[in-house]
Amino acid sequence: MAITKEEIIEAVGSMSVMDLNDLVKAFEEKFGVSAAAMAVVGPAGAGGGDAGGAEQTEFTVNLVEAGANKVSVIKAVREITGLGLKEAKDLVDGAPKPIKEGVDKKTAEEAKKKLEEAGAKAELK
């Protein structure tokens, strides 16, 4: 009997971030595809370039460096992401890494502030 789409979605929804990362890698190897986000090219604007441009609405919080107090940084990462202890530790140990992606400016700034208060070096992109 074949697995239904709903069963697959339920299984993926219950996976940890590390398991999802392994799943993506397996898909890339099995099907020869890349999970990298594709750049979307918008229509060219009329006239010269708009020097100001549109304000960025989605941000990525990057952990640049864990700093001296790794335990506090791991706790902050767990609080920000909801990851388990092992996943958060692996993420901190693997810095520089993105912590949160595609979030609004307020959420990104709050996450950056928590990381910096814990002793980490973080940046917004």
Curated annotation (Swiss-Prot):
GO terms for biological process: translation. One of its GO terms (molecular function) is mRNA binding. CDD domains: Ribosomal_L7_L12. InterPro entries: Ribosomal_bL12, Ribosomal_bL12_C, Ribosomal_bL12_C/ClpS-like, Ribosomal_bL12_oligo, Ribosomal_bL12_oligo_N_sf. Coiled coil: none annotated. One of its GO terms (cellular component) is cytosolic large ribosomal subunit. It comes from the Bacteria. The keyword Ribosomal protein applies. Keywords: Ribonucleoprotein, Ribosomal protein. Residues 95-125 are annotated as: Disordered. SUPFAM superfamilies: ClpS-like (SSF54736), Ribosomal protein L7/12, oligomerisation (N-terminal) domain (SSF48300). The keyword Endoplasmic reticulum does not apply. Homodimer. Part of the ribosomal stalk of the 50S ribosomal subunit. Forms a multimeric L10(L12)X complex, where L10 forms an elongated spine to which 2 to 4 L12 dimers bind in a sequential fashion. Binds GTP-bound translation factors. PANTHER family: 39S RIBOSOMAL PROTEIN L12 (PTHR45987), LARGE RIBOSOMAL SUBUNIT PROTEIN BL12M (PTHR45987:SF4). Forms part of the ribosomal stalk which helps the ribosome interact with GTP-bound translation factors. Is thus essential for accurate translation. Belongs to the bacterial ribosomal protein bL12 family. This is Large ribosomal subunit protein bL12.
